[in-house]
Amino acid sequence: MTEFPVATSAAPGVMGVDWENRVDFERLRQYRLARVRTMLERFDLGAVILFETSNIRYATATQIGYWAFNKGERWALVTREGRPKVWDFGSAAKAHRLQLPHMYDEQNSVGGNTGLQGAIGPESGLHARAVREIKAALEDAGVAQDRIGVDLAETSVLLEMQAAGLQVVDGQQAMMHAREIKSPDEIVLLTQACAMVDGVYQDIFEMLKPGVRESDVVGMAHARLFGMGSEFVEAVNSIAGERCSPHPHVFSDRLIRPGDQAYFDIIHVFNGYRTCYYRTFVVGRATQAQRDAFKRSREWMDAAIALVKPGATTDQIAKVWPKAEEFGFADEMDAFGLQFGHGVGVGLHERPIISRLNSLDTPEEIQEGMLFALETYAPATDGRSAARIEEELVVTADGCKVITLFPCEELMVANEY
């Protein structure tokens, strides 16, 4: 038995090579599309119309950069048979036909526009045109009279769909269920993304000293991640000193001072797959209150990890975490996200979601192939410090494997005096 997590999930180099099996992207595309179609059957949907960016990438393997993330300016249609169809932002439709010619042509990669989130009003006719094209594609597929799932649409577009006689229902649950079980290729990509953050935490640990700002850490982390191949840094939480309690969920330009406890969360995207990965340090020297807070956070984490295996349920995990009132909050809604578990994949918050807020009443079964993060938070008795830990893990046939490997067994003191 090892005393700390070691690399047991492969994280090969990120280049394409002829001498080693790495990620098979064609296999990845086929797996994801098959998962979506399985859920269309399970949820009795003739098709799903996707506006949410992570869903579009999962189902169609297309993306145009994160400037367009969840702006509603592109959408996709997936039916139980045939090729997905993408309506994209202007010239991006032509680019897809060039980039993936075996998947897209002039019939299923076309331009589309629903008004740029209201910047172009319904009087332009763009909303009505988009829905006419969607309905025509559904009729061509023979499913226009079926239940049609929609994930996250603008109100104006949704109303136009209903006016056109489409039987629109919730499609997001089908997509969430599709995404909850990861393929071996997805697990490699998620592990590679974590390996990048392992390296950034080494840099943060060496960087932490008085005079460095929270925002300086954020800037360095962005540069390092992009240098290693990240395609998008969604967030770097950088929280120090009295800002640790309560958790503000946003960095500032505060100067780090001797004795500060500081915690960080790095959320970035590599080849479409995210990380959510907290670590806590203290600068120069640590008080007993800070060490005690870290110890509590680690104990809650270890108790949760010990329960993770196929057949376990999310309420069993949530029950080992303290109640909101036990660490300074009025109720579970106010404390939500502090003792927390969530799937990680093409989206930041996927199934299963684990917390005392939702899991005690509506537990879900843990399944092999799930990949999720567990997060714990313990405020210190000094009223200002706090410890925050997060581990990502893969559910295996007989337990789980941790893939976030920067040391976290005990409180680490950066640049110790």
Task: Give the positions of each predicted feature.
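Active-site neighborhoods and metal-handling regions in enzymes and metal-associated proteins
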Residues: 1-417
